[in-house]
């Protein structure tokens, strides 16, 4: 078969001349494969108290070098040390300065942050040749062993008599799979899906405790109180899951799996006026003695659309009545009732200095696919089985159609070659 026929068949099957020749592959931030021997465009080194992020200036593998000034680490308050070489940019920062949140699991401390490439026009031009991309970064540290130089307190000391620091109770907030048995492996969601959140406290040697979610707020950036506009309250008024009042079916799970665990679902969403496709959820968790009767300040209430009423996970139904007007406080705790996000961080940190039974925990980023920036993050999620099946079906139909065309073209090319060779 002549070269022209081969080229025609390649154009017909591949759809363009650029696919008919060997192509160099690069590892983009979205996870596209790299050629053998090439390094990842973003490398992270998690040290004892700091992290070092090394970014290839040819971040997208296109030959267009990113500007060091367009790279940031974590929230706006983070100011890492930046070292620029010919080919790479290194960002060095302390974990506590640039981490967007800390998650506590059974065996690890997990620090979350993100690398942001936000290109700006240069030289007075109004065009951009690189994309905006946000790369989630995670550093995990094992929790095994006693890191304190002080003697371990006896395990028989009652909770009410124990003077301890906040670290004595390990609070956590995790994204779970639909069956609640395992932690979710991917942070990506599509609109219409449901996020399964599990709040938990490791009580250790304390007497039995019961966990409550006092309030939760969702923001496009990690820290409420910083860049807190826009924001959306999921839980408010000391345990009212107010997100369920809208068109969603967000609710606490009944019954609890354990007193120290509380599970709830949230219909996923994204912020309409935000350029980010990420959402961080920060919850204020607290505990009370397990034998304490739930009340207006310690409750877990969901809105039931069928009965148009608030229902508690446990306790009398009237403890949820205050969710309708948001007045679930009393005179001694009214300071907590009105908490705009900009005031939240300061308020909580000030009041938690002398409190050992509550903590703020952040989970995120939740990454929403389907927006403009998703090409950079879509590589982190597994291909959906439905999409694969649909793709295979379409490919089969296309192959059968093209096979008939190819067969006809092949015969024509063969006949033409035979006729030309006759005079010889």
Swiss-Prot record:
It is found in: Cell membrane. Expressed in oocytes. The keyword Hydrolase does not apply. GO terms for cellular component: collagen-containing extracellular matrix; egg coat; extracellular matrix; extracellular space; plasma membrane. Proteolytically cleaved before the transmembrane segment to yield the secreted ectodomain incorporated in the zona pellucida. Glycans are attached at residues 32, 34, 39, 146, 155, 162, 273, 304, 327, 330. PANTHER family: ZONA PELLUCIDA SPERM-BINDING PROTEIN 3. Belongs to the ZP domain family. ZPC subfamily. This is Zona pellucida sperm-binding protein 3. The lineage of its organism: Eukaryota, Metazoa, Chordata, Craniata, Vertebrata.
